[in-house]
Amino acid sequence: MRQWLGMLPPVVFPMVLAAQQRTDTVTLAPVVVTATRLPTRADALPTSVTVISGARLRAEGIRTVAEALRIVPGAAVVTTGPWGGQASLFLRGGESDYVRVLIDGVPQNAPGGSYDFANLTTDNVERIEVVRGPTSVLYGSDAVTGVVQIFTRDGRGAPRAAVAFGGGTYATNAVEVTASGGDDRAGYAIGLSRFASDGIYRFNNDYRNEVLSGHLRLKPDARTDAAMSVRYGDARYHFPTDGSGDPVSNNQHQVDRGPSVGLELGHVFSDDVEGRVTGTWHRDNAQYAIAPNGPSDTTTFPFSSSDWVTRAGLDGRANLRLSGGNVVTVGGAFEHETMQGTTLDGSRSRDDGAAYLQLVTNLERPFSMTLGARLDDNQRFGTYATYRAGLSVRVHGGTRAIASIGTGFKEPNFFENYATGFVRGNPDLQPEHSFTWEAGLEHHIPGTAVTVRATYFNQRFRDLIDYNGSDSVTYNYLNVPGADARGLEIASEAALGGAVHITAAYTFLDTRVTRGGADTGSTALFLTGQPLLRRPWHSATLALSYRLGRRGSMTVTALYTGRRPDVDYRTLRRDTLPSYTRVDLAGQLDLRQPQAGAPGLAVVGKVENLFDAPYQEVTNFPARRRNLFLGGELRFGTP
């Protein structure tokens, strides 16, 4: 408890400081789409939402979405160290496959929810929206503990272009080319980037990641709009480590590549009726290969695999605007999933259809609510129903109370359903599911740009899928374990005098396995009465940004991660990783504004892990030590 209370001052002090110093700058709440699929101010929603702007990403030198998510309350990002190493997100204590990931509305998760954030860069990103809490009522499977949606730039304003470049420690080098432009009728934005590094290990740790992204929007008349987004990524990561963290291989690597396409069409039929249709397609190729270190290596057997996963979906919905500013959304969705390659015996596919209903009352009123229900019909496990309800009440002045309840589910992945050979999949698996409730208070100090919010959440996860290696069972995967996660999130934001911006957050998390799986050994994932792995009990962030007029900014960010349980696969015992604090320093400075016939020039720099803190996010996998990145940007067009 003392440690918990000790973390509160960094979160609370911006509010106290700002209360003594009034500011002339009032920051408007961002408008979010992901929470209700309707443009809504974040401070009017009965759910927990964090928005990270593209401007902040660039000002703080954040290159990957995984790094950006570290500042989100309730989010635990776990990586295996080098650039390109596996990056997982545990949101509010849930599993790493409990978060739906979208890019411009296109699902990026593999069927079954898994997603590796290692190769998801912030290139050409306009903003990131993070919704915490079950959102299956709108997005179906995978949205158990939340949704992360990345929006790319849609191209507004006079035509402009930029070339960014830089390099740093670990032989890191990067280049990005962007171009955008448009008006109210049409707009475009394209980006091409490449990032590479030699890694932190002495051998076989090269990484390179190339991304092409584009967004096109059209508005042929006042009632019709259309948009298309395209993204293609190609990443290759060499790593010497085995599952225990020992660097043993000179010839081990993996490849992740594939396209993503989204199309959306909207039409306003009348003042009261709007229709929207969204089509999505994502195809991902995951490859892995290992070869002996040399002729004398008789213990490493050559192996390679290649799998293609495809998700194609169609979503149609009608927004009906009722009297009093209330909106009813009626929608239906269909998705086709396939997997083929070397992991499964042949090709497998499944379909899912769904119907959903949502009511959003006028969120500008002192008392407002959201209600939603959904019914999914899956080709494999049958029908499954989810619901969500939220309430927002403006209590007094700048104080608002929120509360919500909801359910979510996650379908099994193809391997858990269809594996053959040494591992036997279970075609009769049921989806993992959850029940969640949360309640909180939000206070905006009148006359200032200071907001403080505290939220308590409680989640129950049931029918978790667990591996049983016994030869006596018909299937190796079974719905057995259950777990609970409860916690407290405190977040504050303050803009002081227009030049200083402070954000702070603290999360307390308590997880517990309520029903263990078949494996009762020390390395088991689910042991009755034990906490879930790799989730810290305490975590906090503090970011202080200072604007240098219109010419640039400097930001210092402190990230604290408390003790968390893990497994040491060298000793085959449970372990507790120690707490650590990482401090980053970033800055940008405009040296020259673009002019006719001459580009503008800006310089950027970042020191990650400023004080060279040694730490591990996964046992035996060291994180990056102090590293420096310096770069520049040439800007063409209107400043």
Where are the predicted features?
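Transmembrane beta-barrel wall of Gram-negative outer-membrane proteins
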Residues: T169-A196, Y201-R236, Q252-E274, L322-N326
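Conserved C-terminal beta-signal and adjacent last beta-strands/turns
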Residues: T178-S180, R217-K219, Q530-P639
